[in-house]
Amino acid sequence: MTNIEKQARKIVRDAYFDYLEIDYSNRELKDHFFKIYYHHMQFLEDLFPETTDEDKLESKWRSMFKKERE
């Protein structure tokens, strides 16, 4: 995994919990971010097939890992 991919994964992970402002000026980082983000959303849709709303998927995901971050 390249350094830029690691950065993108960290941003995706942190963004779910901290709602970070993403700096899109780095096109390569932006491309990796969205690639990982859409892969992640597909994973959530598979994990919670009964939930189709993106906000509800993210909420379920955050609640699963809230205790892990505390």
Set out the residue ranges of the language-model regions.
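Acidic, low-complexity, intrinsically disordered interaction modules
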Residues: 10-65
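Short, charge/polar-rich alpha-helical segments
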Residues: 1-9
